[in-house]
Amino acid sequence: MANYYTDHPEIAFHLEHPLMKRLVELREKNYEDAANGIDYAPVDYEDAIENYRRILGITGDVAANVIEPNSESVDLEGPHLENNRMIYASKTVENLEQTRKAGLYGVSMPRRFGGLNVPNVVFSMMSEIISAADAGFQNIWSLQSCIDTLYEFGSEEQRAKYIPRICAGETMSMDLTEPDAGSDLQRVMLKATFDEKENCWRLNGVKRFITNGDSDIHLVLARSEEGTKDGRGLSMFIYDKRNGGVDVRHIEHKLGIHGSPTCELTYKNAKAELCGDRKLGLIKYVMALMNGARLGIAAQSVGVEQEAYNEGLAYARERAQFGEKIIKFPAVYDMLSRMKAKLDAGRSLLYQTARYVDLYKSLEDISRDRKLTPEERNEMKQYSRLADAFTPIAKGMNSEYASQNAYDAISIHGGSGFIMEYKSQRLYRDARIFSIYEGTTQLQVVAAIRYVTNGTYLQVIKDMLQSEVSDAMKPLKARIAPLVDLYEKAVNYVKEANNEDVHDFLARRLYDMTAEIIMSLLIMDDATRAPELFEKSANVYVRMTEEDVCAKAYYVMHFTEADLASFRAE
């Protein structure tokens, strides 16, 4: 029987990373749950890893044997609107029932609330697996991660009230964007007023492009401070569907991810609770929410990268032209090898980022219970910085790779790829949104570029160059060193130009170079530890990086302020 976890040993490989031992010890707080007699809590590192394998195996089984077989029906039917309520596609309802029965909700939450206490690494693996089966359903399922923000910033009373419901399988949404506030969230105008009589907040206004907008529990960004127009007037609220006051006005008809309802909502005096402190909704809470969501989109992207590669590979093996299978043609195996290299490198970046997030978040959680040692504080600061730096490249690069792999899968299918009966067209339609929502790739560049210019990425790269690799990888590593020198020169050229427009115009090329060098080093490390899985991809990806970094460095270092005139739109 198919299983989307056990069928792909490349996923399981990332459970064996050297950082996992420290990560699990912090996540389990030295296994205190087991010491306190909590059921199913691991007693040591090996027990924890075995728990993760079981959870991933269950996820892989449900993905392969329930969600994927339902995906075509969901894509064709989609959700619909009845009496201002969103109704899921019938097979989406079945997916929800089966994932609930399997216990796949509230998985990141502490066991005292009914959760499984899995780290981000494992949650990201689950997200990847479900996305490979159906990226639209992954949206609905993975929005449970909004509960992490409530856990982090909500009161103990709110935790006790809402977290067990998510662990039981209720759904969530994050209601941020509005008709006039898309990427520019400081323009949010949904109004929050305090009801003295009822001792609660009331929300009024419209939200647009809300994924899973008719969910059970919403986190809502709203303007709580009268007379303000910027981000400092915004707060975060919890809206419970049981209280009423929110209608679904419209469900968007989209290019892809048809099973995932994208809603326009009207808030009409809806009762809500303040989450955290006033005025910190955008500048603190939404930033945490968005970083988690961006990691989720990176995982969603890797799932589609994998499925697109699977579809292309299977078709190339069976399709014969000119007397032989098309997989024998250089033009085809060139595409397939690049697809696999992007997949393996992108997955490595995803899980390295998730590990950094886990290490930082676990130390932060421990700091709520006790004072951290000076060494732990330094460790938390280090991993916080790395998580912040790696998240935008993990999201941006993987979302682009998903579209590229889906595009190439269609190319391998030829005319059949353009026919609706083949899955590759759906993967292509689904993938297109990944580089748009939760911040376009251009916004990921904006988030990352300061780490390019302040030398953070360069130091990470130089540190990675010091790590030992296998004899087979040493020639590749030697080829990366001159690329790093070229990259450093390109960065310095842009900094020395001292022109903001030139800096912004060239930022994307510097971002791409950064990510490609980092992923080259990551995939070499993977190939050192598991050559049977990654050696081919390492060779292909380093060659791709050489080609791209050299071309982009040349472009950057031959660009001047005068060149901008040719590109400016009138």
Residue ranges and their predicted role:
Residues 1-82, 86:
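Extended, charge-enriched "interface" segments that sit outside catalytic cores
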Residues 2, 9-10, 19, 257, ...:
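Alpha-helix capping/hinge segments and adjacent helical runs
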Residues 36-37, 242-245, 249, 261-293, ...:
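A glycine-rich, basic-preceded beta-loop-alpha segment at the flavin cofactor/substrate interface
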Residues 60-61, 91-164, 168, 211-213, ...:
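Internal helix-loop-helix
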Residues 200, 204-246:
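A short core secondary-structure module
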Residues 318-342, 352:
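Terminal amphipathic helices with adjacent charged low-complexity linkers/tails
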Residues 344-395, 491-505, 528:
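C-terminal helix-coil-helix/basic helical segment that borders enzyme active sites and/or dimer interfaces
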Residues 455, 467-570:
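C-terminal amphipathic alpha-helical interaction region
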